[in-house]
């Protein structure tokens, strides 16, 4: 029995029926990581000893008849900007090389308390700044569908690990599409929850008003399961909302009769690969056949989301990353003469090119004389975009679009063209600007590579997204596609 072929909810059932032990399941996945990861490069740290100890402890609980939680012994990986006690937390940056987290992020704590076995930390773009996982200071993660292509980013390690069956589940973070776009490129399911649905305590900040921890799995049910575990109010994060978390499993119904879906015409313009467009239109026919009503709408301000996003995110990054100064932790330059030198040289030596670029852009946007022209204006645009989404959700249950304008591209293809790379997030960024939830799920192939469909929902309506996504998934076979490694 190859446990790596099972999804998390299936492994949970096998373990609860005593048809497998947590240790057996953990060992099988660790073996897969050893065999596959030298090709894929999804992991930055493999926590073999910790995982086996946790698995044995869960088996011990089961032997006493104790409940081990919603995850029930399923393995998972954690993006390397989410703190896990006694594991590295480098954010794929040289500036945090060797840093070991002394505490758990709230989401890591939740995963452990609900019977999840953490197999290690996953690669990413440095400080989550990027769309391809080529900006990692340590290694380039490869797409399991084609090892010469990117897995997406910044949670590329998370998506690649799930797609290659190294883990059935993973946590990532999503600031402008960093869970959904890699999910699309790797042919899996990825959810970015509503801003405030999931705690950010213990997550290294990039853009504090945009960041959200998201979930990745090989099907909608697995994503719903992991989202259930990490959602809810947290006294350590005052931005979490004290709003009831529904039982997401109850929303996994194929019945979507009467659901109203909006189709924004601005998301189907120049730059969209015709094969991706066809996959989305084919998917719309499935939603119609299942009883949903689809209407074309206009979201004209969505065109300004990318511009507003890069001003806001970079401004927040400029502030958030000021703490990495070579004084308290992380890299410290050895060739220094005074305190200013420590700060300047440590950051110059250890931050990567993309991180430096975004810090400079953000500092410029916040500087005297430019604040009103750039940052303040971007905040106004953000409010207008939020208003547009809120108006649509008065009449509709969801909005559908492509997740990305193209399938996965070749490694190195867009590294020298920043604008082209940034425009790859054109469909995902508006979601973070507005703070709404969105899910990406596989809906077809283009040139043998997965295509993702994005469903956006109203605030705290993740259950509606799971309902629509599950209905589509059960009517198609795309989620059963797997890469051959």
Swiss-Prot record:
A Pfam family: Amidase
Name the domain of life. Answer: Bacteria
Q: What class of enzyme is it?
A: ligase
The record's GO molecular-function terms, alphabetically, read: ATP binding; glutaminyl-tRNA synthase (glutamine-hydrolyzing) activity
Cellular component, GO annotation = glutamyl-tRNA(Gln) amidotransferase complex
Which reaction is this enzyme known to catalyze? Answer: L-glutamyl-tRNA(Gln) + L-glutamine + ATP + H2O = L-glutaminyl-tRNA(Gln) + L-glutamate + ADP + phosphate + H(+)
Which Enzyme Commission number(s) are listed? 6.3.5.7
Q: Which residues form the active site?
A: 79, 154, 178
A biological process from GO: translation
Protein biosynthesis keyword on record? yes
Keyword set, alphabetical order: ATP-binding, Ligase, Nucleotide-binding, Protein biosynthesis
This protein's record includes keyword Heme = no
- HAMAP family hit by this protein: GatA
Quaternary structure annotation from Swiss-Prot or TrEMBL: Heterotrimer of A, B and C subunits.
Q: Which family does it belong to?
A: Belongs to the amidase family. GatA subfamily.
Role, per record: Allows the formation of correctly charged Gln-tRNA(Gln) through the transamidation of misacylated Glu-tRNA(Gln) in organisms which lack glutaminyl-tRNA synthetase. The reaction takes place in the presence of glutamine and ATP through an activated gamma-phospho-Glu-tRNA(Gln).
Protein name in UniProt: Glutamyl-tRNA(Gln) amidotransferase subunit A
Q: Which gene encodes it?
A: gatA
């Amino acid at each position: 029995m190859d446990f790596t072929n099972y999804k998390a909810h299936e492994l949970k059932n096998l373990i609860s029926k005593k048809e497998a032990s947590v240790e057996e399941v953990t060992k099988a996945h660790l073996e897969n990581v050893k065999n596959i990861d030298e090709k894929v490069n999804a992991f930055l740290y493999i926590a073999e000893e910790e995982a086996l100890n946790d698995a044995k402890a869960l088996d011990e609980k089961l032997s006493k008849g104790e409940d081990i939680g919603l995850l029930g012994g399923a393995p998972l990986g954690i993006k390397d900007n989410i703190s896990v006690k006694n594991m590295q937390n480098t954010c794929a940056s040289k500036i945090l090389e060797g840093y070991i987290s002394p505490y758990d992020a709230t989401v890591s704590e939740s995963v452990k308390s609900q019977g999840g076995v953490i197999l290690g930390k996953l690669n990413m773009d440095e400080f989550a700044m990027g769309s391809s996982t080529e900006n990692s200071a340590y290694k380039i993660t490869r797409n399991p569908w084609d090892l010469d292509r990117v897995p997406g980013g910044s949670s590329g390690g998370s998506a690649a690990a799930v797609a290659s069956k190294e883990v059935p589940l993973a946590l990532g973070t999503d600031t402008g599409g960093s869970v959904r776009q890699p999910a699309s490129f790797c042919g899996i399911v990825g959810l970015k929850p509503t801003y405030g649905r999931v705690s950010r305590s213990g997550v290294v900040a990039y853009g504090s008003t945009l960041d959200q921890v998201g979930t990745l799995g090989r099907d909608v049910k697995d994503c719903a399961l992991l989202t259930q575990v990490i959602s809810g109010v947290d006294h350590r994060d005052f931005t979490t909302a004290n709003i009831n978390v529904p039982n997401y499993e109850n929303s996994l119904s194929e019945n979507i009769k009467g659901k109203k879906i909006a189709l924004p015409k601005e998301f189907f313009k120049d730059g969209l690969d015709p094969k991706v467009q066809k996959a989305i239109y084919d998917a719309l026919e499935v939603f119609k056949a299942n009883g949903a009503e689809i209407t074309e709408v206009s979201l004209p301000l969505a065109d300004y989301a990318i511009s507003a996003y890069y001003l806001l995110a970079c401004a927040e990054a400029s502030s958030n990353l000021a703490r990495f100064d070579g004084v308290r932790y992380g890299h410290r330059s050895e060739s220094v003469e005074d305190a200013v030198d420590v700060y300047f040289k440590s950051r110059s030596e250890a931050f990567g090119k993309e991180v430096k670029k975004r810090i400079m852009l953000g500092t410029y946007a916040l500087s005297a004389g430019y604040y009103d022209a750039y940052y303040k204006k971007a905040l106004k645009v953000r409010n207008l975009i939020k208003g547009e989404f809120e108006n649509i959700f008065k009449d509709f249950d969801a909005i559908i679009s492509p997740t990305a304008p193209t399938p996965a591209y070749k490694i190195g293809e867009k590294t020298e063209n920043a604008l082209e790379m940034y425009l790859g997030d054109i469909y995902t960024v508006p979601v973070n600007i507005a703070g709404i939830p969105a899910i990406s799920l596989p809906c077809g192939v283009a040139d043998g590579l997965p295509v993702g469909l994005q469903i956006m929902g109203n605030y705290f309506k993740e259950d509606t997204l799971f309902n629509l996504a599950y209905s589509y998934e059960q009517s198609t076979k795309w989620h059963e596609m797997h890469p051959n490694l």
